């Protein structure tokens, strides 16, 4: 289908490289370079240059990488999700109305980064340890959620606006 494929690294030089070559479409799998909105950087460049691309737009990616903002939006639209709080420091471990067990995650990472067996906490001491690990290792807040037991599924949506289709559910299994 496409005879001329160019690989462009998602770094500081990407903008100029996109400007140099006329692209029919960009297959965006970029994670971005730096910062909490890193996954939105390439789509924002492509929007500015009016180059079509696959995947979510810059705004969607920026919001989704912030787990707390995503959960607030889900809650606003009455989509059920686990109770949570955001911890910036160990002292925040006492400011919650959640039940154990809980799961502690970096607030602005994806693909399971920063989540280990120790992320599932059953006591205030374990909670403090995990908040400290995430705030020190990742230099960002920790998202603390009540752990929801059960099966884990992910859904993909293909298309935009009124032409979107939900693809079949995929179960995420760790066994």
Descriptions of predicted regions:
Residues 102-130, 152-154:
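Glycine-rich phosphate-binding loop of ATP-grasp-fold ATP-dependent ligases
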Residues 124-175:
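Phosphate-binding site of ATP-dependent enzymes
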